[in-house]
């Protein structure tokens, strides 16, 4: 089984209005991809290669202040024509060790060109409450990845385990400035543009990520339906390399999470309850605050009704965050200002015809 794909795309990105933090950017992309699936002895082999040629045309505006207060600010616009050529490869070996157990090993080298926002942002972004500053000198991000996965199924029981390690050269991330940098910008009279917003810069450093995803469960057949119970957990740790300028953790890492789900379904009725235990996140980057853990409990019940031969209605009841936990999402830029929603309960009515 072989496939060849070609893709040509052009994108014009323009942010206008009060939140105009980036000048218009034109991007042109040309992609060639090849995919192969074959047998190699006892292994199923999947191989893919992708070549991208990306051009981004944009500009960055900067206001210059005259010493005389009566003079208007002069805006200087610098134009950029940036080109990136990337190559990505991936190969996966899979084998059925038994009738119930499948094991796979995947290796990949993935190159990613910087996005338009990472290159050309230069202004207040209200969603993140940051004054974001891109960098037109960012280079291609290169990731070397290894993934090992096991999947098991037998008589209603199922389990999966996935472990991965990623070494990323020139990892691109958005980092809040330090207090010292903030004071320096204040001295440069940039406070007028930042206001109360935190200045954040797009930077690059080598980083390493290691993590896992685990899931185990069972589906039980009952007289009138099926009951499925599952337990899962995931975790990831990302650190900048020891030889990088910053040896701290990568910002906004997802904390360790444990999931428990109980679901029942029949021909016209379904119900479920889920528990999500999110651990505290103390593995933080410089200038980043830690986040406390929390437990979320959600439930849902749905019933289907036949109103006529061709018309059906589904009535759903949902309740989210039943314990009314005060929870904050560590991966959010505004976690300290905006917590997750508290307890909310409601009904949904869906009619199909």
Protein language model annotation of sequence segments:
Residues 8-14, 40-42, 51-57, 107-113, ...:
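Transmembrane beta-strands of outer-membrane beta-barrel pores
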Residues 1, 32-38, 91-95, 138, ...:
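Residues on the lipid-exposed face of transmembrane beta-strands in outer-membrane beta-barrel proteins
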Residues 1-72, 76-96, 102-104, 108, ...:
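Face-selective signature of the C-terminal outer-membrane beta-barrel domain
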Residues 169, 279-283, 303-353:
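C-terminal beta-signal and adjacent terminal beta-strands/loops
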Residues 164-168, 185-284, 323:
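Gram-negative outer-membrane beta-barrel transporters
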Residues 1, 37-44, 95-99, 142, ...:
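Outer-membrane beta-barrel strand-turn architecture
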């Amino acid at each position: 089984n072989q496939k060849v794909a070609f893709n040509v795309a052009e994108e014009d990105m323009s942010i206008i209005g009060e939140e105009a933090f980036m000048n218009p950017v034109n991007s042109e992309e040309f992609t060639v991809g090849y995919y192969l699936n074959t047998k190699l002895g006892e292994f199923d082999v999947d191989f893919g290669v992708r070549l991208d040629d990306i051009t981004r045309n944009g500009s960055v505006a900067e206001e210059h202040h005259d010493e005389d207060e009566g003079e208007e600010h002069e805006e200087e616009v610098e134009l950029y024509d940036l080109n990136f050529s990337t190559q990505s490869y991936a190969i996966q070996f899979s084998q059925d060790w038994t009738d119930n157990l499948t094991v796979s090993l995947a290796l990949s080298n993935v190159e990613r060109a910087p996005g338009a926002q990472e290159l050309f942002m230069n202004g207040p972004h209200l969603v993140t409450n940051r004054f974001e500053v891109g960098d037109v000198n960012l280079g291609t991000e290169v990731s070397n990845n290894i993934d090992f996965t096991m999947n098991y199924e037998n008589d209603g029981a199922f389990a999966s385990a996935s472990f991965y390690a990623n070494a990323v050269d020139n990892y691109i991330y958005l980092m809040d400035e330090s207090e010292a940098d903030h004071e320096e910008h204040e001295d440069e009279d940039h406070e007028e543009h930042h206001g109360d917003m935190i200045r954040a810069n797009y930077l690059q450093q080598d980083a390493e990520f290691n993590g896992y995803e685990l899931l185990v469960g069972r589906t039980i057949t009952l007289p009138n339906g099926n009951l499925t119970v599952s337990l899962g957990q995931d975790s990831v740790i990302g650190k900048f390399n020891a030889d990088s300028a910053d040896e701290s953790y990568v910002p906004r890492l997802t904390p360790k999470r444990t999931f428990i789900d109980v679901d029942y379904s029949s021909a016209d009725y379904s119900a479920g309850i889920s528990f999500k235990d999110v651990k505290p996140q103390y593995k933080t980057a410089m200038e980043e605050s830690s986040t406390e853990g929390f437990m979320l409990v959600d439930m849902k019940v749905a019933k289907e009704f036949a109103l006529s031969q061709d018309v059906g209605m589904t009535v759903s009841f949902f309740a989210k965050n039943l314990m009314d936990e005060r929870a904050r999402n560590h991966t959010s830029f505004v976690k300290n200002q905006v917590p997750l929603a508290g307890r909310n309960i409601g009904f949904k009515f869906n009619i199909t015809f």
